[in-house]
Swiss-Prot record:
It is found in: Cell membrane. It comes from Homo sapiens. This is Leucine-rich repeat-containing G-protein coupled receptor 6. Glycans are attached at N77, N208. The chain crosses the membrane at residues 568-588, 599-619, 645-665, 688-708, 728-748, 775-795, 810-830. Residues 589-598, 666-687, 749-774, 831-967 are cytoplasmic. Receptor for R-spondins that potentiates the canonical Wnt signaling pathway and acts as a marker of multipotent stem cells in the epidermis. Upon binding to R-spondins (RSPO1, RSPO2, RSPO3 or RSPO4), associates with phosphorylated LRP6 and frizzled receptors that are activated by extracellular Wnt receptors, triggering the canonical Wnt signaling pathway to increase expression of target genes. In contrast to classical G-protein coupled receptors, does not activate heterotrimeric G-proteins to transduce the signal. May act as a tumor suppressor. Disulfide bonds join C642-C717. The lineage of its organism: Eukaryota, Metazoa, Chordata, Craniata, Vertebrata. GO terms for molecular function: heparin binding; protein-hormone receptor activity; Roundabout binding; transmembrane signaling receptor activity. GO terms for biological process: bone regeneration; cell population proliferation; G protein-coupled receptor signaling pathway; negative chemotaxis; positive regulation of canonical Wnt signaling pathway; positive regulation of cell migration; positive regulation of Wnt signaling pathway; Wnt signaling pathway. Belongs to the G-protein coupled receptor 1 family.
């Protein structure tokens, strides 16, 4: 019987002869290469390629040329194949039937296809292997049966396919390895059984596949492997066990002596035993990431001379660096998220070709000398516990280009540590504890990261880094040398937006290969490198330095305008001097004991003094650093002076608001208490309230010292975050604003209630109208000035509209402390108590002084609604004459409290009951009576006399701290 090539030749001759008319000349026309009507054909010599795909065919064209070598019927609507349909296509080498609706193929469907080498039946609905049909294909080399519904492969399915080299059975419903069926494929070189439901691989499953080179078993449910599962695979080079449920390391791979690429990532393997790859000396790549590996034998990776990539992530129990003896070709080593504490001193001797060393997220504390790893190009040591860099740690690494030491605890770096790194272009020292940075050897840097080193206030000139393009420093002041003025720098957030836009553009242009996950290489080109390339292409590349200076990070002046500077100094002088005068007159010249409201007003003056002192400290810093603030800005922000300034500012402002709230509530409560109980709250309770307010204000001021908020966020040392601050930094600011806003609401409610209660009774016995009016003025002024602060704070938090840093800075420097100087001015200019207290502080020139001053002072006081009558001048003269004619013996050493003069009236004049002047019915605030010049009632505020009086010719006889007299 002739061989297949012989048969092919015979059939070719027969086809050529049949194509001519018997005994005649060739006829004009399409000839033997006529193409079926719906298909597209292409000639290849005397052979024909017919493309009938995606035409919606429901049957195979019947007029196919016998010389067709390629036939594509994929993506049609074929549901069945008739026996003998392709019998005349003796020269057909490739037949594509994928993407149809074939559920069954009869036994004689492929009869006559002796030359067929490639048969594609994927993406159909086959429920089994068309074994009888395949027996007719002795030359078949590639068979695709993937993406069908095959659940069982009979023993004789591939019988007769002795030439088959490639077999696809993936994406089916197989539950076991078709061991017996595979025994008939001795020439098979590549097979995939992926995406099935296989749960176990028995021993000797592939023992007859001695020619197999590639085996894919990924995306199954494999939990166990037999010890001899891969026995007989003497030529296997690639084994894929990824995405399974393996519980143990596949020790069966030790029989694969020619294995070069091994993948078993995304399994449940927890340990890699000692000498795990002892039988695989030709291994080049191992992928086993995304496994819960907790233990790795120290000798697991020994004697793998061909291995060039090793990636091991998340093995938390690994505390010692693996012994890589004999693994001399390793180029990329990744051991992250493990527990490695120490690197062996001989590591570089074992790995002379190492180019990339990634040891991030470990517990390394000390580094050995890496000078023997002279081919190193990238080192990643971020997120470790390294505290020192020695002189020889990175010496002689002339090829090193990128060094990442971020998120460590590095305190010191030897001055010569980087001196030999001539190729270094990227250095990352973010979030360490550096105080200085040695510059030797860093002249070629293009990207330098130093953020998070709060103790590093060192200035970096342009001459230190002539090639620098991207600089990230702890403080914006260190960016000042890279711009001539504040306008040079971009507005806050502009660079960030451009970076994001650039990232979006480049990600769409970047090849897909760079976006795919590469377990062996985490150093794909990133945005920083892209920016470096773009900057190099510019004729005059500039340095992108962050964070950028601005109004809250000035380069030259803390106060950038003379208007703000003069306003701050005016606030300082007025607040300190005026509040000091208020404190002096209230506590040194006032009556004893002090009225409760007056005591609170004095406490407010003390709080305002603290605000003035804090503003004075800022003004002094501006004066001392005039024109060169960037040289001292970092030290000022991190120093004790800034924290003290912020503490005083918050303590003063919060105490002022809380004490003002207390004063308003005290006035309102006094009215209610007098009406209900006949007496007002005592001075002791008010003092307790003052202490509570001061304690609450002190707590608020101390929170930023405990890292709740921050005083050093800006050189103003206030916890109010600038507009570009992080949302987390705004939390403390918003809390303060909301608390103060609540206090002003309480104040408003208290005074509304107070004025509603005024017409309901006669409260002149406990009423000090001047102080109540003064508190009302304080509420109005302070509330009005606090509105811009609250508005800008909420606008920044909610993002209602963009707020310029200049506006925020002006409000914080001028508007926020303005009540500290306005409050005492209101007291000094409009409150009659100040003049009374000031007179008491003056030296007494004569005996009549105290009484005269008391009487004159009471004349200057006016009532809330003009119902408290003024004392007639004749009565004052009477008192003055009496004091000059005969001086009582005890009057010289007696200190009188402030005196309220109330006229006793006729008819229906008030009667004296004890120490109170009681009006008859119908005589209230709105119904005054004519006064009598000869009768006066002198009564001390807030005190009750025991008795006694002033007779016509006698002297004063005071009792206790108060006196009453009826003339």
């Amino acid at each position: 019987m002739p061989s297949p090539p012989g048969l092919r030749a015979l059939w070719l001759c027969a086809a050529l002869c049949a194509s001519r008319r018997a005994g005649g000349a060739p006829q004009p026309g399409p000839g033997p290469t006529a193409c079926p009507a719906p298909c597209h054909c292409q000639e290849d010599g005397i052979m024909l390629s017919a493309d009938c795909s995606e035409l919606g065919l429901s049957a195979v064209p019947g007029d196919l040329d016998p010389l067709t070598a390629y036939l594509d019927l994929s993506m049609n609507n074929l549901t069945e194949l008739q026996p003998g349909l392709f019998h005349h296509l003796r020269f057909l080498e490739e037949l594509r039937l994928s993407g149809n609706h074939l559920s069954h193929i009869p036994g004689q469907a492929f009869s006559g296809l002796y030359s067929l080498k490639i048969l594609m039946l994927q993406n159909n609905q086959l429920g089994g292997i068309p074994a009888e049909a395949l027996w007719e294909l002795p030359s078949l080399q590639s068979l695709r049966l993937d993406a069908n519904l095959i659940s069982l492969v009979p023993e004789r399915s591939f019988e007769g396919l002795s030439s088959l080299r490639h077999l696809w059975l993936d994406d089916n419903a197989l539950t076991e390895i078709p061991v017996r069926a595979l025994n008939n494929l001795p020439a098979l070189q590549a097979m995939t059984l992926a995406l099935n439901r296989i749960s176990h691989i028995p021993d000797y499953a592939f023992q007859n596949l001695t020619s197999l080179v590639v085996l894919h078993l990924h995306n199954n449910r494999i939990q166990h492997l037999g010890t001899h599962s891969f026995e007989g695979l003497h030529n296997l080079e690639t084994l894929d066990l990824n995405y399974n449920k393996l519980q143990e390391f596949p020790v069966a791979i030790r029989t694969l002596g020619r294995l070069q690429e091994l993948g078993f990532h995304n399994n449940n393997i927890k340990a890699i035993p000692e000498k795990a790859f002892m039988g695989n000396p030709l291994l080049q790549t191992i992928h086993f990431y995304d496994n819960p590996i907790q233990f790795v034998g120290r000798s697991a990776f020994q004697y793998l001379p061909k291995l060039h990539t090793l990636s091991l992530n998340g093995a938390m129990d690994i505390q010692e660096f693996p012994d890589l003896k004999g693994t001399t070709s390793l180029e990329i080593l990744t051991l992250t998220r493990a527990g490695i504490r120490l690197l062996p001193s001989g590591m570089c001797q074992q790995l002379p070709r190492l180019r990339v060393l990634e040891l991030s997220h470990n517990q390394i504390e000390e580094l050995p000398s890496l000078h023997r790893c002279q081919k190193l190009e990238e080192i990643g040591l971020q997120h470790n516990r390294i505290w020192e860099i020695g002189a020889d740690t990175f010496s002689q690494l002339s090829s090193l280009q990128a060094l990442d030491l971020s998120w460590n605890a590095i305190r010191s770096i030897h001055p010569e540590a980087f001196s030999t790194l001539h190729s270094l272009v990227k250095l990352d020292l973010t979030d360490n504890q550096l105080t200085t940075l040695p510059l030797a050897g860093l002249g070629g840097l293009m990207h330098l990261k130093l953020k998070g080193n709060l103790a590093l206030s060192q200035a970096f000139s342009k001459d230190s880094f002539p090639k620098l393009r991207i600089l990230e420093v702890p403080y914006a002041y260190q960016c000042c040398p890279y711009g001539m003025c504040a306008s040079f720098f971009k507005a806050s957030g502009q660079w960030e937006a451009e970076d994001l836009h650039l990232d979006d553009e480049e990600s769409s242009k970047r090849p897909l290969g760079l976006l795919a996950r590469q377990a062996e290489n985490h150093y794909d080109q990133d945005l920083d490198e892209l920016q470096l390339e773009m900057e190099d292409s510019k004729p005059h590349p500039s340095v992108q330095c962050s964070p950028t200076p601005g109004p809250f990070k000035p380069c030259e002046y803390l106060f950038e305008s003379w208007g703000i500077r003069l306003a701050v100094w005016a606030i300082v002088l007025l607040s300190v001097l005026c509040n000091g005068l208020v404190l002096l007159t209230v506590f040194a010249g006032g009556p004893v004991p002090l009225p409760p409201v007056k005591f609170v007003v004095g406490a407010i003056a003390g709080a305002n003094t603290l605000t003035g002192i804090s503003c004075g400290l800022l003004a002094s810093v501006d004066a001392l650093t005039f024109g060169q603030f960037s040289e001292y800005g970092a030290r000022w922000e991190t120093g004790l002076g800034c924290r003290a300034t912020g503490f005083l500012a918050v303590l003063g402002s919060e105490a002022s608001v809380l004490l003002l709230t207390l004063a308003a509530v005290q006035c309102s409560v006094s009215v209610s208490c007098v009406r209900a109980y006949g007496k007002s709250p005592s001075l002791g309770s008010v003092r307790a309230g003052v202490l509570g307010c001061l304690a609450l204000a002190g707590l608020a001021a101390a929170l930023p010292l405990a890292s709740v908020g921050e005083y050093g966020a800006s050189p103003l040392c206030l916890p109010y975050a600038p507009p570009e601050g992080q949302p987390a930094a705004l939390g403390f600011t918003v809390a303060l604003v909301m608390m103060n806003s609540f206090c002003f609401l309480v104040v408003a409610g208290a005074y509304i209630k107070l004025y509603c209660d005024l017409p309901r009774g006669d409260f002149e016995a406990v009423w000090d109208c001047a102080m109540v009016r003064h508190v009302a003025w304080l509420i109005f002024a302070d509330g009005l000035l606090y509105c811009p602060v609250a508005f800008l704070s909420f606008a920044s938090m909610l993002g209602l509209f963009p707020v310029t840093p200049e506006a925020v800075k002006s409000v914080l420097l001028v508007v926020l402390p303005l009540p500290a100087c306005l409050n005492p001015l209101l007291y000094l200019l409009f409150n009659p108590h100040f003049r009374d207290d000031l007179r008491r502080l003056r030296p007494r020139a004569g005996d009549s002084g105290p009484l005269a001053y008391a009487a004159a002072g009471e004349l200057e006081k006016s009532s809330c609604d003009s119902t408290q009558a003024l004392v007639a001048f004749s009565d004052v003269d009477l008192i003055l004459e009496a004091s000059e004619a005969g001086r009582p013996p005890g009057l010289e050493t007696y200190g009188f409290p402030s005196v309220t003069l109330i006229s006793c009236q006729q008819p229906g004049a008030p009667r004296l009951e004890g120490s109170h002047c009681v009006e008859p019915e119908g005589n209230h605030f709105g119904n005054p009576q004519p006064s009598m010049d000869g009768e006066l009632l002198l009564r001390a505020e807030g005190s009750t006399p025991a008795g006694g009086g002033l007779s016509g010719g006698g002297g004063f006889q005071p009792s206790g701290l108060a006196f009453a007299s009826h003339v």
